[in-house]
Amino acid sequence: MSGLSNKRAAGDGGSGPPEKKMNREEKTTTTLIEPIRLGGISSTEEMDSKVLQFKNKKLAERLEQRQACEDELRERIEKLEKRQATDDATLLIVNRYWAQLDETVEALLQCYENQRELSSGTEVPGCQEGLTRDVIPRPDPGTSDLREPLPVQFRAPLSEPALAFVVALGASSCEEVELQLQGRMEFSKAAVSRVVEASDRLQRQVEELCQRVYSRGDSEAPGEVARVRTRELGRENRRLQDLATQLQEKHHRISLEYSELQDKVTSTETKVLEMETTVEDLQWDIEKLRKREQKLNKHLAEALEQLNSGYYVSGSSTGFQGGQITLSMQKFEMLNAELEENQELANSRMAELEKLQAELQGAVRTNERLKVALRSLPEEVVRETGEYRMLQAQFSLLYNESLQVKTQLDEARGLLLASKNSHLRHIEHMESDELGLQKKLRTEVIQLEDTLAQVRKEYEMLRIEFEQNLAANEQAGPINREMRHLISSLQNHNHQLKGDAQRYKRKLREVQAEIGKLRAQASGSSHCIPTLSHPDDPGLNALAPGKEDSGPGPGGTPDCKKEMALLAGATSATSSIKKEELVSSEDDAQALTPVTQGLPSRGREPEARPKRELREREGPSLGPPPAASTLSRADREKAKVEEAKRKESELLKGLRAELKKAQESQKEMKLLLDMYKSAPKEQRDKVQLMAAERKAKAEVDELRSRIRELEERDRRESKKIADEDALRRIRQAEEQIEHLQRKLGATKQEEEALLSEMDVTGQAFEDMQEQNGRLLQQLREKDDANFKLMSERIKANQIHKLLREEKDELGEQVLGLKSQVDAQLLTVQKLEEKERALQGSLGGVEKELTLRSQALELNKRKAVEAAQLAEDLKVQLEHVQTRLREIQPCLAESRAAREKESFNLKRAQEDISRLRRKLEKQRKVEVYADADEILQEEIKEYKARLTCPCCNTRKKDAVLTKCFHVFCFECVRGRYEARQRKCPKCNAAFGAHDFHRVYIS
């Protein structure tokens, strides 16, 4: 029954795995759609940590899935083990039935061979000729020829039911049977087919014999007695054949029932042996109780004897200070009554035990009878048993489950195909998305590479131009330095010229002072000479004293020329200074612009001063005509005073006119300066040079005209002067004029040298100016180019930064796409693994389905055989059930008797313990008369319990955690150190960590 229940449980649980697989497939479909959200990422480390967290999460999920799969596999293994156990049991049953079938078939074949041998000697020759084609030569049943199928030419034609049975046996070919059972299957099929053929052949032989007998009887017309005899013999033969088949069927059924009952008998024998052991244990306990009862009886007898003899027990020397204890008659009678009751109880218990033993022996005898009866069970009883019905129900359940498994397998195949197609579509979609993303990424990377190459080219061009500009600046640096040195040398030269001009001014002042002295001397000597000067000519009046001092008129022209040359040199120097300052202002970032603006006014001041000095010198040099020598000195002095006043007024007028001219020239210079500032550099230089040239030419022409006029006046005046004193002065003046002319020649040479040098320097300055202009233009162009390059470089840097940021963003996108691709690859791998697992499980399910289909067909055949056997076993089963019904009350009675016996035993033990306690109390009462003594005795007992049982001196303070027995710590430690590591009471082994102290308060 347990095997059947296990089978049913396995069958019920067999429908579980497909549902779990369905659930697992649903889980896989849900995990496919689950998105991967990493959140905001600021660095690669954070992304790596989040990816690791996601991987750990996925690994945990995979571990959970694996654990769930392992649990499912464990459950499946347990179910398969249970199923294997049930299959083994069924296989054992099938093997047993099959072996019995082979034995019966061999027995039948042996009987048939024996009958053939017996009938071969007694047959009629005519019958032998007729039977030669029907009888097949048969080997021994034990030989290996039985295991080979018979050839077709030796087989006789069979009847329709026999042929159908043989065909059914042949249909159960080796396709459903394993290779190791194939030989046995062939042997069984051959043997059964031969048995069927033999039975059919015998039947046909009998029918042929009957027909021959009838035909011969009709033809030969024998006696009626022979016919009746043959008919009776045929009927008897048929009856005997039917009886033989029935007996064989009964023998087969009985053998099967015998094997089953033999198994049950073995189990009951084991149970009986167990019960016998329990009975022996109970008998041993009863003997123990008897011995204890005898001891108690002895003690009671001694107590009675002491009581009857009037013996008094005095206190012992153990420290109890009690008086004598005497037992009253009432207590003694009570004890006697209790003793008698206990004896009666023991006797009754003994009788009960004997009765139980007798019942046990009767149960054993009935069990043996039942064993014998179980060997012949009717078939109806077997059919009505619960096991047979359970087998039928289980067969129907298995058949229905096989149909359900087929439908579930078809559904699983459909789901697998659908999931496979959806998986393939999903993979194609993912591959197309991946290809599109890769194409986009490639195009973006190519664009970025192109832009990066362009930026690199522009950067290289800018770098080359920057290096060229640096080289050009390095080349222009020494030229600029040379120009600065030249400008500084020209400035130094201008300073030297200014110093010379100051020196000449100082000399001019000295000369004017000498002229003043000469005028004073001349005024003293020529006060009588009448003035013949023209009032309208201020220049002659101004030059008259000079003539008196310096002699003839032409003597004053070299000094004037020298001064004019000095003035021209000063003006050219100022113009060159202006040009140099303009160039230096352009080179030095307009650092000297105030100097260039202030120089024209400084240049005009020295121009105005020499003019005033010349006029001052010319004024006194214009003295009276030579005809004035005849005048008296008083008249001269008067005329001189008047003339001085007139000269002063004329000088004031001249100074005012010069002031006006200077103001006009100042205005012109201001206009020129404004024009110079507004005009470009080259035009300013040209205008300045042309203005200086015109001014110098005008001054030179003016000075030449003045010199001519002075020479003419000197000639006219030289004719008039006749004084010796005048002659002497004239000589001195001529000498001075010669000296001045020599100086003027020297100064002219110097002026020519300076003019040539100025021309050379002007030419060089113009060349340098042009070169500076070109260099400045180149510098401007280079500055513009540098500015352009710098702006382009800034733009390129910005573009480079933007491209780098875009590259970083694209790199992050690429990393994200790579992570997505990796995740998708992981999901694809997981799906492939799941697909492989599903394919493997599908293959396993298909194999299991094939096995189940084979098992189903086997079960069908077994069911057919079982149906055939069930009819045979029904009668035996009914018989066995009746016997079992008879045995069950006996078993119930025996069980009740055993329970009663155990109950009585327990009750006896309780009574004995109760009596023992009473006896101990009575003993204490007898020994100790006082209650204090009883308490002291109990205290002593408790103290004895608290003392160590090993040494009996120290108290218990250590416990063994293995068995929880208590001893003193010194004894336990001593035993541990002496390697006696076992408990003194129960011999349980203990270690170093298996004992510790206990503190009993």
UniProtKB/Swiss-Prot annotation:
The modification Phosphoserine is found at S42, S584, S585. There is a cross-link at K578, K579 (Glycyl lysine isopeptide (Lys-Gly) (interchain with G-Cter in SUMO2)). Component of the RNF20/40 E3 ubiquitin-protein ligase complex that mediates monoubiquitination of 'Lys-120' of histone H2B (H2BK120ub1). H2BK120ub1 gives a specific tag for epigenetic transcriptional activation and is also prerequisite for histone H3 'Lys-4' and 'Lys-79' methylation (H3K4me and H3K79me, respectively). It thereby plays a central role in histone code and gene regulation. The RNF20/40 complex forms a H2B ubiquitin ligase complex in cooperation with the E2 enzyme UBE2A or UBE2B; reports about the cooperation with UBE2E1/UBCH are contradictory. Pathway: Protein modification; protein ubiquitination. Component of the RNF20/40 complex (also known as BRE1 complex) probably composed of 2 copies of RNF20/BRE1A and 2 copies of RNF40/BRE1B. Interacts with UBE2E1/UBCH6. Interacts with RB1 and WAC. It comes from the Eukaryota. Its main location: nucleus. Transmembrane segments: none annotated. Its EC number is 2.3.2.27. It is found in: Nucleus. It comes from Mus musculus (Mouse). The keyword Calcium does not apply. Keywords: Acetylation, Chromatin regulator, Coiled coil, Isopeptide bond, Metal-binding, Nucleus, Phosphoprotein, Transferase, Ubl conjugation, Ubl conjugation pathway, Zinc, Zinc-finger. GO terms for molecular function: mRNA 3'-UTR binding; protein homodimerization activity; ubiquitin protein ligase binding; ubiquitin-protein transferase activity; zinc ion binding. PANTHER family: E3 UBIQUITIN-PROTEIN LIGASE BRE1B, RING FINGER PROTEIN-RELATED. This is E3 ubiquitin-protein ligase BRE1B. Residues 55-91, 189-377, 437-525, 627-946 form a coiled coil. GO terms for cellular component: HULC complex; nucleoplasm. Residues 565-576 have a biased composition (Low complexity). It catalyses: S-ubiquitinyl-[E2 ubiquitin-conjugating enzyme]-L-cysteine + [acceptor protein]-L-lysine = [E2 ubiquitin-conjugating enzyme]-L-cysteine + N(6)-ubiquitinyl-[acceptor protein]-L-lysine. Residues 18-28, 602-619, 633-647 have a biased composition (Basic and acidic residues). Belongs to the BRE1 family. Residues 1-40, 122-142, 519-647 are annotated as: Disordered. A zinc finger (RING-type) spans 948-987. The modification N6-acetyllysine is found at K20, K355, K517. It is an enzyme of class 2 (transferase). The keyword Nucleus applies.
